Swiss-Prot record:
Source organism of this protein record: Oryza sativa subsp. japonica
Region (Disordered) location: 38-63
Name of the protein described by the UniProt record: Large ribosomal subunit protein bL32c
Family matches, as InterPro entries: Ribosomal_bL32, Ribosomal_bL32_plant/cyanobact, Ribosomal_zn-bd
A GO cellular-component term linked to this record: plastid
């Protein structure tokens, strides 16, 4: 015999909704920090061009 389910209380709904929101928030924060680190990691892969400052350090006079 089919029995209707009891209705879920508003507080339980709110708790479950907030848990879902927390999970999504933390996944967003994690993905944002990963994207930030990836965008700045490319800086170290490409060395700076050797310019005036590089030549100046090599031509020091020791005395």
């Amino acid at each position: 015999m089919a029995v209707p389910k009891k209705r879920t209380s508003m507080s339980k709904k709110r708790i479950r909704k907030n848990l879902w929101k927390k999970k999504t928030y933390f996944s967003i924060v994690q993905s944002y920090s990963l994207a930030k680190s990836r965008s700045f990691s490319g800086v170290s892969e490409h060395p700076k061009p050797k310019g005036f400052s590089r030549q100046q350090t090599n031509n020091r006079v020791l005395g």
